């Protein structure tokens, strides 16, 4: 291998490493996170994930905001397991049912 071929091989190696470094820099600067933020900033989205909590490897609690209302959703095994309904809970869940007064016996 003479001197010219060695210089050519080193130049090709430097060029390849430079391209890899350029790709890493571009992914950091313009990667999926920044693209997602740019799209979200351009659009007023109706559905937003506020917070997510992994309960175990298969189940996850997610707080989502839909049209300004927050809902709690339980996800697991690739399907919806439970969700909080719209509106306040029924009155029976808040207070015990009224007990009928006993009638006097004559």
Curated annotation (Swiss-Prot):
The keyword Cell membrane applies. Pfam families: FliO. InterPro entries: Flagellar_biosynth_FliO, FliO/MopB. The keyword Transmembrane applies. It is a single-pass membrane protein. One of its GO terms (biological process) is bacterial-type flagellum organization. Residues 84-106 are annotated as: Disordered. One of its GO terms (cellular component) is plasma membrane. Keywords: Bacterial flagellum, Cell membrane, Chemotaxis, Flagellar rotation, Membrane, Transmembrane, Transmembrane helix. The chain crosses the membrane at residues 9-27. It comes from the Bacteria. Disulfide bonds: none annotated. It is found in: Cell membrane; Bacterial flagellum basal body. Belongs to the FliO/MopB family. This is Uncharacterized protein CC_0952. It comes from Caulobacter vibrioides (strain ATCC 19089 / CIP 103742 / CB 15) (Caulobacter crescentus).
